[in-house]
């Protein structure tokens, strides 16, 4: 299967939405879609009394509206800093490029975002916001965790549209040749970095597992298990679910070029996901030990 010839810049008819070096890209639209749909889902959760029992919802609609800005900044700043620390500084070629072009670290529109960096940025945003609003930060995390797979899903679809983060070579029926005129035109050397062989569409695998499947698991935990009443359970489920999915899919995802060799054949994605699994397992064990407190003890949102 040949990769579809999709321009990463959004077009309206024959016109590209581009102004000099700035362009509206599918990747940017994915962020917008993930944030907007996640915001609406979080609002819906706060308004669904059945998932809270006798407890007061963790945050008000107004607080959710304010939190969106904090989370957006966390995603952008954390995602870029994470890519800089976890990937650019670990890569000899990229370190040399940065030494010659230090301002490129700010060119977010040219790509280069790390999920794990964005995750840490969102965690920081939640902690700071919770302290400011005097909200239990773990319960606030429980409200935001079910939202995250929405953004992950759209982000991975955008990775596929961009023809980036492809998988390893395969002769299976799902193999895709990530090479077309658009990819060549957007590469400085006018080549297809993925080469001429079919590869796993690992972006779509990740969209399915880290996005759709994880969203459904968390929704089941909310609506059937009533885990919004169980402090930390949804955060733990997200950490475990994402970490395990990413750990498994790193085996079909093409290793990052130029990265050093890690022990036991691990990749950077694996090394960053293992702590999520360990933290999620410990937090879920701790959460399940405590009885569900189906009362209004939590707090009254400010």
Curated annotation (Swiss-Prot):
GO terms for molecular function: phosphatidylglycerol-prolipoprotein diacylglyceryl transferase activity. Coiled coil: none annotated. NCBIfam families: lgt. The keyword Cell inner membrane applies. Its EC number is 2.5.1.145. It is an enzyme of class 2 (transferase). It comes from Caulobacter vibrioides (strain NA1000 / CB15N) (Caulobacter crescentus). This is Phosphatidylglycerol--prolipoprotein diacylglyceryl transferase. It is found in: Cell inner membrane. A 1,2-diacyl-sn-glycero-3-phospho-(1'-sn-glycerol) binds at residue 156. The chain crosses the membrane at residues 19-39, 67-87, 108-128, 143-163, 203-223, 232-252, 264-284.
């Amino acid at each position: 299967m040949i990769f579809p010839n999709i321009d990463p810049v959004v077009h309206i008819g024959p016109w590209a939405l581009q102004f000099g070096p700035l362009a509206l890209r599918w990747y940017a639209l994915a962020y917008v879609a993930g944030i907007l749909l996640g915001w609406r889902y979080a609002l819906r959760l706060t308004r669904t009394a059945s998932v809270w029992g006798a407890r007061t919802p963790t945050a008000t609609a107004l607080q959710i509206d304010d939190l969106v800005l904090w989370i957006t900044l966390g995603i952008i700043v954390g995602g870029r800093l994470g890519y800089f620390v976890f990937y650019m500084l670990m890569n000899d070629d990229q370190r040399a490029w940065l030494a010659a072009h230090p301002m490129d670290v700010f060119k977010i529109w040219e790509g280069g975002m790390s999920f794990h960096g964005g995750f840490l940025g969102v965690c920081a945003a939640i902690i700071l916001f919770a302290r400011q609003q005097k909200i239990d930060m773990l319960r606030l995390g429980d409200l935001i965790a079910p939202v995250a797979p929405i953004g992950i899903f759209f982000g991975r679809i955008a990775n596929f549209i961009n023809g980036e983060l492809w998988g390893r070579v395969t002769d299976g029926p799902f193999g895709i040749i990530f090479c077309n005129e658009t990819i060549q035109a957007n590469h400085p050397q006018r080549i297809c970095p993925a080469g001429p062989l079919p590869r796993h569409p690992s972006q779509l695998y990740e969209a399915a597992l880290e996005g759709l499947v994880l969203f459904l698991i968390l929704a089941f935990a909310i609506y059937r298990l009533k885990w919004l009443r169980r402090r930390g359970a949804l955060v733990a489920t997200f950490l475990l679910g994402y970490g395990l999915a990413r750990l498994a899919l790193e085996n079909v995802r093409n290793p990052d070029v130029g990265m050093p060799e890690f022990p036991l054949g691990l990749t950077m994605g694996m090394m960053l996901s293992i702590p999520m699994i360990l933290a999620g397992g410990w937090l879920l064990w701790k959460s399940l030990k405590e009885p569900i407190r189906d009362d209004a003890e939590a707090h009254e949102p400010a």
